[in-house]
Amino acid sequence: MSQNKAFSTPFILAVLCIYFSYFLHGISVITLAQNMSSLAEKFSTDNAGIAYLISGIGLGRLISILFFGVISDKFGRRAVILMAVIMYLLFFFGIPACPNLTLAYGLAVCVGIANSALDTGGYPALMECFPKASGSAVILVKAMVSFGQMFYPMLVSYMLLNNIWYGYGLIIPGILFVLITLMLLKSKFPSQLVDASVTNELPQMNSKPLVWLEGVSSVLFGVAAFSTFYVIVVWMPKYAMAFAGMSEAEALKTISYYSMGSLVCVFIFAALLKKMVRPIWANVFNSALATITAAIIYLYPSPLVCNAGAFVIGFSAAGGILQLGVSVMSEFFPKSKAKVTSIYMMMGGLANFVIPLITGYLSNIGLQYIIVLDFTFALLALITAIIVFIRYYRVFIIPENDVRFGERKFCTRLNTIKHRG
């Protein structure tokens, strides 16, 4: 596949389908949390009960992610993306009509399965469409997720203030997924192979990657990065109400600030990652910023700190470092992008399953301990990002025509080693 073909009209339709699906995925991730009060009343439960319900999303990801990685590599990207859309349709149309918590949990599992299918189809497809700019391509996924997460809290707040039935907030995304289905059926996807001429312009391996070191560190980074922003998405409104004295409508808007922050980061780094900054540098910087911010949110809770903190966490932890982690791990292990993505995201699914259970328990003890947990995850992300950063420049030789910010000394050292060898 040539780089020019990636921009032809048939592939652009496929790219639009993927990005639009991630916009709606962003909504699906926070739907249960944003409607926590309405759903708790509907199912006669409390916040911990809805946290249990949310854990079904993680279970769905956990049980399906490896399966879809194999399917994506064998049968193609479009097939698994279509499977994802079907699962999303079941969730959005099913929750409003769901009679009990048990069935709702099954629908939450469907969202997790849908996310697995979308990730193992969408990420590899985007990297295959834009092999020279895979970092920018995958980080824009986060932009679309953030658009969805910025829009949806505003919709929920509007419906809450105007006494509109919460179910309309699920039916509308369901209708949009029907439109995506029609678009997917007409779209074409690129080949799973990349031209050798393109590959030669990318960083070349100087030594064999170590699965037990950079492989494990990359996966742990993904878990920590996911958990850092996931905790904020679910629990920041409740924390802001309890410790900053904010009303429910005001507290829900913290997630809009969070999404705005992630969008700002996405567009800044989408530009920087093309030629100026390599993803591993972005991951170290952003995880350090998230660690500092989580500490401030815990130590100095106030409306200003909660709103600003949500924005900065959105910028740092949710601004695409999870997606960049996938891109970096695919560089270390490039032979099977979907399988790499599935392993990486499987651990995120494990976190998606376990973290709601832990935070649900902590919510009964004290919401402040949830923020302490968030700080711990941010710190783990920083430590593992530094490990991957160090290993990257030991494994790869940076081409002279692709030296980026801060890399000159690394590039010179590694090229010297190569010539001596």
UniProtKB/Swiss-Prot annotation:
Record-annotated disulphide pairs: none
Q: Does the keyword Transport apply?
A: yes
Assigned keywords, A-Z: Cell inner membrane, Cell membrane, Membrane, Transmembrane, Transmembrane helix, Transport
Q: What membrane topology does the annotation report for this chain? A: Multi-pass membrane protein
Q: What is its main location?
A: membrane
**Spans within the Periplasmic topological domain:** 31-49, 100, 158-163, 237-251, 301-308, 364-369
Can you cite an annotated GO cellular component?
membrane
Chain ranges sitting on the Cytoplasmic side read: 1-9, 71-78, 122-136, 185-215, 273-279, 330-342, 391-421
Q: Which GO terms describe its molecular function?
A: transmembrane transporter activity
This chain belongs to which protein, by name?
A: Inner membrane transport protein YdiN
Q: Say which species the protein is native to.
A: Escherichia coli (strain K12)
Top-down, what is the taxonomic lineage of the species of origin?
Answer: Bacteria, Pseudomonadati, Pseudomonadota, Gammaproteobacteria, Enterobacterales
